């Protein structure tokens, strides 16, 4: 141990060391300030480039106002409390061990008390202000509230009070609570530190000034508690105590009265604390405070629990009936399903020839091409170069072809996947390879003779139906779902597209073999496609295309640099980016992206633009932060331009009596779990949702337009007041755009989950729960244990004269697998019946199989196994497509395409080879839908093919030499079987299919000849 000699100088820290901390802190602050400035400036420039500066400034002003309000509230509350406690400190403190110990702290704090004071007040103010800015949307909704025109069932208040006003009042009371509590704690600490409160004193323990100060703070706290009790009674409409969400019997008959009683008790306690300023006796208010706490436990907690246990539980159904009914009605209204029509549907399981003939006209519209399977086919046939890509799940839209027919269409945008790997560097990634090129579209109900999609729009430069709009068509895609990184345009020459690309020949409408032909003689007499006559087998084509595609995908350095095969370049002339007008702009973006090349690259001039926030959904979210955006934007050609269509929702979690739902859970299905192309909604709990906005994002210039779709929605009206001019009127939607708008997937998935229970509108039946449904798991073997996604298809609903473009789904009973119901919603936005939701409810005793059961029947059927077994034993990969369910001839028909992909080659892709169908308890398989249906209905082809005349029938009966015909037929069958097996071993699926057709035809002839022999013997 060492001692410092008296008078010896104190060791001092070197000057450099003493400056290190403040200099370091200053550097950190400066860097943070510069980064904040860069972010602020680039955000402002971006909003200016898209024309939504109103959103930027409104949000900024609101956040600044709330920051100032929250900071001022906390600063005043804590600052005044500390200041008053210090100024009223006693001049004389009685001597005690307690005060002796505190003297050391006082001597340390006093010289720096101003620093401590402003540090404490400033720090708390900053934290509170920053926290308050998060409530900017709550404040704007409160300030611009729009009435719903409907009242809650308990208090009779307009729904807007609960949706807009109630949440803001909760926020205000919460911040006042926090400020008073912290002010009280700070006051107690200062009073204790300076002797105003003495815990070990023999006489007076609290000085008069401290008593007044703390009594006022406790009185204010109790006034706030009283206000909170009063507000909590309205919050009972969000209670989850009862059988359903919302105020229950116990809430209305016990908790409500408890809140009112506690409100008055809190008021009395507050008055007693204020009176303590004059009466100078803290016992009475403190005792009253203890009694209030006890009352809150007994009246607010124990009493309702007794009522629930003793009164409600033994008589729950009778007592909860009116409250269950309130919940049913509110939930159906909040989710927009109150107009859903439930139709009793006793689905038949057998058909007559006449019934089948009546449905023949709907057969050609069945969408067999599965958008979740053919992505790889699009990739192989239409990728063109290896740096283009298609999403894993394509989209289903509708287009009117040049012959005037409107068809379900599988569409995808050919987006950029970054530069070739050997050229992947900063310049090529951000300045050269900047955009995708063109749309690709295929008919949803047609394939060619080998099972490939029939393309309506294809190739580079674009060819086909979608681009036939004259000179104005713009195929370039600068904004898309794969646009995660920024690009800088009008700098280097941009790669546009390959000149004279060596792309594989693709099937078009001239090559189509409709798998579901209409029952006309002309269709039966159609010649075989040129592909099948001239080009050889599908496998040979796949191998050749794979070689071409492999060369395209890998490419030579010469090709991908723009030499050799050549390339077209492009200079952007749109307004979709932020112009880099000055060195300052370049500096700000270099800081934002931490990329020095933005400053150093000489090609970047004052005319260059930086394009970022390129994902359509993200772009809409940014200009409309009050909206929840659907997980799947889809492309469409509208008036000669590719646009992305984005559905957006207004939501709330404050709709009285409506059951809340987790959006992420409700919108999760096979696609969201197995691919990155479809996203579930964010995991927010809401109990109100509307598809209030349809947004478009131009793929070339990034223009964002928000159309008010549900203009009667009070939530949208509220936001339109807060952000005037941001949402465009629905009347501005063009007819072309309207034809591509559709019922949104995520809204439908939310509604179908609610309808699992809320298709029941009677409280007693709802309480019983025997008729609850569930969405079945996707039955496909590759789907995993995920809910089946909804499917878009054109169907004819029972009782309708014409087919309707619909979004469909099925339900099974909870705990069972047979089919309970089929639901369809009109998805044609140009129709007056858009959004009409109809549900076919089957009897409990139905024999109709559910999706899981029919899939199991498909896979275990001897007829199906006979066809699939040779494929599965080979190297081929068999993929089950979307299992479609559709009303058909008084029953429900299941249709599932079957795809086959050759193994052993990266260049192979799925081909539609077979179609599975099921009706009632019968299943069948065929090379197309017509054949599958003929097999399903005992080979009765009369409704689907040209009928045979009576004369022809007599002629066939009179044909001689039945025995020789039988022998010849059997010989042909054996020959066809051998040829089919040989083709299968070689992987030639086209030849295999043809051999199977000859085998079937030979067996039919053999059966006919055998029947003729039997008649002769008789």
From Swiss-Prot:
Q: Does the keyword Coiled coil apply?
A: no
Q: What is the superkingdom listed in this entry's lineage?
A: Bacteria
Q: What is its main location?
A: membrane
Keywords of the record, alphabetical order, are: Cell membrane, Membrane, Transmembrane, Transmembrane helix
Q: How does it sit in the membrane?
A: Multi-pass membrane protein
Q: According to its UniProt record, where is this protein located? A: Cell membrane
Transmembrane feature ranges: 20-40, 64-84, 115-135, 171-191, 212-232, 254-274, 287-307
**InterPro entries (alphabetical):** UPF0182 (IPR005372)
Q: Which regions are flagged for Acidic residues bias? A: 542-560, 939-959
Q: Which HAMAP family match?
A: UPF0182
What name does this protein carry? Answer: UPF0182 protein Tfu_0541
- The organism named in the record is Thermobifida fusca (strain YX)
């Amino acid at each position: 141990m060492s001692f410092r000699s008296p008078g010896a100088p104190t060791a001092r820290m070197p000057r450099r060391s003493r400056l290190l901390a403040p200099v370091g802190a200053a550097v950190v602050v400066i860097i943070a300030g510069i980064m904040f400035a860069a972010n602020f400036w680039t955000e402002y420039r971006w909003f200016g480039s898209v024309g939504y500066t109103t959103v930027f400034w409104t949000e900024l002003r609101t956040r600044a106002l709330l920051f100032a309000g929250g900071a001022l509230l906390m600063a005043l509350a804590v600052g005044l409390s500390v200041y008053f406690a210090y100024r009223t400190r006693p001049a004389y403190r009685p001597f005690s061990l307690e005060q002796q110990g505190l003297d050391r702290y006082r001597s340390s704090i006093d010289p720096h008390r101003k620093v401590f004071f402003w540090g404490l007040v400033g720090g708390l103010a900053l934290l509170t202000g920053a926290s308050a800015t998060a409530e900017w949307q709550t404040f704007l909704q409160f300030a611009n509230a729009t009435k719903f025109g409907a009242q809650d069932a308990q208090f009779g208040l307009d729904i807007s009070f609960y949706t807009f006003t109630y949440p803001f009042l909760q926020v205000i009371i919460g911040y006042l609570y926090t400020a008073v509590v912290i002010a009280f704690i700070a006051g107690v600490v200062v009073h204790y530190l300076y002797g105003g409160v003495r815990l070990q004193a023999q006489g007076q323990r609290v000085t008069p000034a401290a008593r007044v100060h703390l009594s006022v703070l406790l009185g204010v706290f109790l006034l706030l508690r009283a206000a909170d009790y009063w507000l909590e009674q309205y919050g009972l409409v969000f209670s989850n105590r009862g059988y359903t969400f919302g105020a229950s019997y116990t809430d209305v008959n016990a908790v409500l009265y408890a809140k009112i009683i506690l409100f008055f008790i809190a008021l009395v306690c507050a008055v007693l604390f204020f009176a303590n300023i004059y009466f100078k006796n803290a016992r009475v208010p403190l005792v009253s405070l203890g009694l209030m706490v006890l009352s809150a436990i007994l009246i607010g907690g124990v009493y309702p629990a007794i009522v629930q246990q003793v009164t409600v539980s033994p008589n729950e159904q009778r007592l909860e009936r009116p409250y269950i009914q309130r919940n049913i009605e509110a939930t159906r209204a909040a989710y927009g399903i109150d107009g859903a029509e439930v139709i009793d549907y006793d689905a038949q399981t057998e058909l007559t020839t006449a019934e089948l003939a009546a449905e023949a006209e709907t057969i050609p519209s069945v969408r067999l091409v599965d958008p979740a399977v053919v992505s790889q086919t699009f990739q192989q046939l239409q990728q063109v170069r290896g740096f283009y890509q298609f999403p894993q799940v394509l989209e289903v839209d509708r287009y009117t072809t040049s012959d005037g027919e409107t068809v379900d269409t599988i569409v995808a945008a050919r987006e950029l996947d970054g530069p070739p790997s050997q050229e992947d560097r900063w310049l090529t990634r951000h300045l050269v390879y900047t955009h995708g090129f063109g749309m690709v579209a295929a008919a949803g109900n047609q394939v060619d003779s080998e099972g490939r999609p029939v393309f309506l729009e294809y190739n580079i430069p674009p060819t086909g139906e979608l681009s036939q709009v004259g000179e104005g068509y713009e195929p370039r895609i600068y904004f898309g779902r794969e646009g995660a990184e920024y690009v800088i345009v009008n700098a280097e020459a941009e790669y546009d597209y390959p000149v004279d690309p060596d792309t594989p020949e693709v099937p078009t409408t001239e090559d189509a073999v409709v798998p579901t032909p209409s029952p006309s003689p002309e269709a039966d007499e159609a010649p075989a496609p040129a592909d099948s006559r001239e080009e050889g087998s599908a496998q040979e084509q796949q191998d050749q295309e794979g070689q071409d595609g492999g060369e395209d995908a890998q490419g030579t350095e010469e090709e991908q640099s723009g030499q050799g095969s050549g390339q077209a370049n492009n200079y952007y002339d749109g307004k979709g980016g932020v112009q880099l007008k000055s060195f300052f702009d370049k500096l700000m973006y270099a800081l934002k992206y931490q990329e020095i090349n933005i400053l150093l690259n000489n090609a970047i001039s004052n005319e260059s633009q930086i394009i970022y926030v390129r994902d359509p959904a993200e772009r809409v979210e940014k200009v409309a932060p009050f909206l929840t955006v659907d997980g799947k934007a889809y492309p469409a050609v509208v008036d000669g331009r590719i646009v992305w269509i984005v559905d957006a929702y207004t939501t709330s979690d404050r709709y009285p009596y409506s059951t809340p739902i987790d959006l992420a859970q409700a919108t999760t299905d096979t696609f969201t779990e197995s691919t990155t192309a479809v996203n579930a909604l964010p995991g927010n709990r809401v109990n109100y949702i509307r598809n209030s906005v349809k947004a478009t994002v131009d793929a070339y210039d990034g223009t964002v337009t928000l159309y008010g779709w549900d203009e009667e929605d009070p939530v949208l009206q509220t936001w339109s007041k807060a952000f005037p001019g941001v949402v465009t009127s629905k009347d501005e939607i063009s007819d072309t755009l309207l034809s591509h708008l559709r019922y949104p997937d995520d809204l439908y998935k939310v509604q179908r989950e609610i309808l699992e229970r809320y298709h029941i509108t009677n409280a007693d039946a709802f309480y019983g729960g025997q008729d609850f449904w569930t969405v079945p798991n996707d039955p496909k073997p590759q789907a995993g244990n995920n809910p089946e996604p909804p499917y878009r298809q054109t169907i004819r609903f029972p009782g309708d004269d014409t087919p309707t473009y619909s979004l469909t789904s099925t339900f099974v009973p909870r705990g069972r697998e047979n089919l309970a119901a089929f639901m369809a919603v009109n998805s044609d936005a140009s129709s007056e019946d858009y959004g009409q939701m109809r549900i076919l409810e089957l009897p409990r005793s139905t024999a109709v199989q559910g999706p899981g059961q029919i899939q199991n029947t498909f896979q275990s059927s001897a007829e199906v196994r006979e066809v699939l077994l040779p494929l599965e034993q080979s190297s081929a990969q068999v993929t089950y497509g979307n299992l479609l369910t559709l009303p058909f001839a008084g029953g429900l028909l299941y249709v599932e395409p079957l795809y086959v992909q050759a193994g052993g080659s990266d260049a192979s892709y799925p081909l539609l080879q077979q179609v599975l169908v099921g009706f009632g308890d019968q299943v069948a398989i065929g090379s197309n839908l017509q054949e599958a249906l003929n097999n399903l209905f005992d080979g009765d082809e009369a409704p689907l093919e040209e009928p045979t005349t009576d004369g022809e029938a007599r002629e066939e009966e009179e044909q001689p030499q039945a025995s020789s015909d039988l022998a010849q037929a059997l010989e042909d069958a054996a020959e066809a079987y051998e040829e089919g097996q040989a083709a299968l071993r070689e992987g030639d699926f086209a030849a295999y299919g043809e051999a199977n057709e000859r085998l079937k035809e030979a067996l039919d002839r053999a059966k006919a000849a055998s029947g003729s022999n039997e008649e002769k013997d008789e």
